[in-house]
């Protein structure tokens, strides 16, 4: 079974659907993994790391998609790209199915089974595939770091010979995954 990881071409996208450590596990399980050259570059993973993990590297995106039994990517494919997928293939990515009806219809017409990552329920059973919670967790952390860099003061309480600086007060709106991580990060930074 051939699993394909195409490079993301959306401007500003730095994520990759599969990292080299996961490639090792999939290859050990008997899958053949092909990665488009440069797919992991913006996430800090060189092609050589994928090769060391057991993946093949290709520069031919069309052949990669045509031959794949499973396609893993972060962003949705273009409607035009769906015709490159073979009938019976499985496509896994964020799809935005409520707003991308034409794309969902095209995938269905092409006989491609689609898994929309944002529709996977947040349950214990599906936890290993819950990409939204992972992304929200990172977002909560990053937002506090970015907010701290914009403050005209420091977050933790500091006692110096010149006086004491009281800790910053942080107000987080929301208590979902991102909000809870933001609260935890702000507390760890001393707010």
Regions from the PLM with identified roles:
Residues 76, 138, 176-177:
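Residue-level detector of alpha-helix initiation sites
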């Amino acid at each position: 079974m051939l699993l394909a990881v195409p490079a993301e071409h959306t401007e500003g996208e730095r994520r990759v659907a599969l990292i080299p450590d996961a490639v090792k596990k999939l290859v050990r399980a008997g899958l053949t993994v092909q990665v488009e050259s440069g797919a992991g570059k913006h996430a800090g993973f060189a092609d050589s790391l994928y090769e060391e993990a057991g993946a093949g590297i290709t520069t031919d995106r069309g052949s990669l998609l045509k031959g794949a039994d499973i396609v893993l990517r972060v962003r949705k494919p273009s409607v035009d790209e769906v015709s490159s997928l073979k009938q019976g293939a499985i496509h896994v990515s964020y799809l935005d199915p409520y707003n991308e009806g034409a794309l969902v219809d095209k995938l269905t017409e092409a006989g491609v089974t689609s898994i929309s990552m944002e529709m996977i329920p947040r349950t214990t059973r599906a936890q290993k595939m819950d990409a939204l919670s992972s992304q929200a967790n990172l977002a909560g952390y990053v937002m506090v770091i970015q907010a701290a860099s914009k403050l005209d003061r420091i977050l933790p309480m500091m006692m110096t010979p010149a006086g004491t600086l009281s800790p910053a007060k942080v107000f987080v709106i929301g208590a979902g995954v991102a909000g809870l991580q933001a609260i935890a990060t702000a507390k760890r930074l001393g707010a």
